[in-house]
Amino acid sequence: FEPGCRNNWHIHKATKGGGQMLIGVAGHGWYQEEGKPAIEILPGTVIHIPANVKHWHGAAADSWFAHLAFEIAGENASNEWLEPVTDEEYDKLK
């Protein structure tokens, strides 16, 4: 991700199992679940995202960012892409 780049809010759906794992590998990034504070991602940070949790992830405003993203196998798994993270939401991150 280039500085300031982030994906839209999205959900990794599954009726059993599922979800996603993120591992920070370079730079500085963010992960946020809807209604919760953002979590900083640095190299070595591991984030487990349960199935059916609305979230987003991306780079910090002043840093390139890279992560490995792994889909966790689940039953009836699918992804739902939602609205963009607004500049107002993103600009609150420190």
Descriptions of predicted regions:
Residues 4, 41-62, 72:
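Conserved metal-binding segment of the jelly-roll/cupin
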Residues 5, 12, 29-31, 56, ...:
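Ligand-binding pocket scaffold of soluble enzyme catalytic domains
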Residues 5, 15, 74-76:
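Feature marks short, surface-exposed loop/turn motifs that line or immediately flank catalytic pockets
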Residues 6, 16-43, 53:
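A short beta-strand-loop-beta hairpin characteristic of the jelly-roll/cupin
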Residues 14, 45-47, 87:
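A short, sequence-level motif marking secondary-structure junctions
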Residues 19, 49-51, 90-94:
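Short, surface-exposed linear segments at secondary-structure transitions and domain or protein termini
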Residues 56-94:
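Double-stranded beta-helix
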